């Protein structure tokens, strides 16, 4: 999995590309946690447009990030979620606690 990050005026934008499964989630949690610790953002925007697959391990990444940001009084938003990943987020109720936008249909 590839992680691309960019900070813009207090917002840390993180794009995830590839498969977010058990193996990828573990390293992604560490890497994203490190980015948050260094950047101390007011908000984080996950862009999932490049995700080809996500299982429940992706939920662990989201919850871990959400809790870390809560410690900083920062917000989390998830955008451009592909249909397969959206089903996982919806089944877990993530979209009820974190603003989540589906990928636009083109």
Tell me what each language-model feature is:
Residues 1-52, 64-106:
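STAS-like cytosolic regulatory interaction modules
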């Amino acid at each position: 999995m590839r992680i691309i990050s960019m900070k813009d005026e207090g917002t840390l934008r993180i794009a995830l590309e590839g498969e977010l499964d058990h193996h990828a989630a573990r390293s992604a949690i560490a890497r994203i946690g490190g980015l948050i610790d260094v950047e101390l953002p007011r908000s984080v925007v996950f862009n999932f447009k490049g995700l080809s697959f996500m299982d429940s391990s992706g939920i662990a990444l989201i919850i871990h990030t959400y809790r870390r940001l809560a410690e900083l009084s920062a917000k989390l938003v998830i955008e451009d979620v592909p249909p397969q990943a959206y089903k996982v987020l919806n089944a877990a109720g993530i979209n009820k606690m974190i603003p989540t936008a589906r990928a636009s249909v083109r």
